[in-house]
Swiss-Prot record:
Gene Ontology cellular component annotations, sorted alphabetically: extracellular region
GO MF: neuropeptide hormone activity
GO terms, biological process: neuropeptide signaling pathway
Domain of life, source organism: Eukaryota
Name of this chain's protein: Pyrokinin-5
UniProt xrefs under PROSITE patterns: PYROKININ
Classification via InterPro entries: Pyrokinin_CS (IPR001484)
Similarity annotation: Belongs to the pyrokinin family.
Subcellular location: Secreted
Species annotation: Mastotermes darwiniensis (Giant northern termite)
Lineage of producing organism: Eukaryota, Metazoa, Ecdysozoa, Arthropoda, Hexapoda
Modified residues (Leucine amide): L17
Amino acid sequence: GGSGSGETSGMWFGPRL
């Protein structure tokens, strides 16, 4: 839900770079 695309388990920031 932040700067990235890896939202898992209700996390806010999960940038999969």
